[in-house]
């Protein structure tokens, strides 16, 4: 059945794509994907949906860049009276998810990178959280030159970079829409985009 999906002579059936066509239960035919998490537990792009998305990608060997900047800061109360726990608390869930999937049964080589904009209210907590609390994810700070100029946390950020706990990434736009970095910080994609 999957062979019928790729009958065109110009479609290269090599590597991951060929392996996936032969065994759709195996690794995904993509290496990397991006998910921008909305500030809601529910919904197609909410926090719970991101857990399912990340779980699926990691299970099949893809890397996932999870962008958390839309999540309200720790302690913020919304119009329903619900108090946010902030992006760092959810980062711990992604870390545990990656550890469990990577170790559960067969080793998979998917990576998980968390992203947070430098101007997010919880950026200091994000930068200074010990590696022991987020051991199975990498952390990336997304910024513009103006954000760098304005931040009071240059020292903490540089210490995080020096220790290998923090990566930096430029914020980019395409056709007036923000695009988001993938795991290796080389390709920018829309949410749920793949490379």
Predicted features by range, described:
Residues 1-195:
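Extended catalytic cores of very large enzyme megasubunits
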